Amino acid sequence: LVILDFDDTGEYKIDNKNILKSLEFLFSKKNIAGIFANQLGTYYDMWTLRDEKYCKNDFWAEVLQNICAKVYPIDKISNQILEEVKDDYIKKKTYSFNINQEPINVHSAFGGFGIYKMENVLNNNRFYEGTQTVDLKFKDNTTTKTKFQKCEHVNFNFGFIDQNCELYILPYLINRDLMDLTFSPEIALKLIIKN
């Protein structure tokens, strides 16, 4: 199963040799269920990424939690707070994966292009899911919960982990030209689901 973003990332022509190399890797072990693309420069799909080294939890939910920890519940969020979160959290969680790096074992990824083994897709008991509840704690230690968007690929990808399968970002599987991308903390505020 091939999944591809149909925005500007999906327009990039992936090198045919790297697609073949990726398929060889995918089928090199029975327990590899899926492979995902990388980008030159900043890896742009932090929302989907879950692993033990780079991003254990939802990137944008953690951005929101970092914002809330710096304000009181009634405060307006200032540009200074947003800049602090950008410097203290986002910049530390912005990565580039060298094309010569070894495949990166992950719990979830996408990067605009992914290939899954159909056998594992058919055995996947999880579906695409786009909402979650996020716990928030403010500067005065008051807490609340909020409905928040969730990257739809994550739950689906966890279904492969449930099957004891492996997923990988392949650093050589490039699907975007060099781009120095920065993530804006305001995006986290836009992902709050208002009822």
Predicted regions and their residues:
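C-terminal catalytic/acceptor-binding lobe
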Residues: T94-N195
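Conserved catalytic core of nucleotide-sugar-dependent glycosyltransferases
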Residues: D8-V134
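Short aromatic-hydrophobic micro-motifs that form the base-stacking/packing surface
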Residues: V2-D5
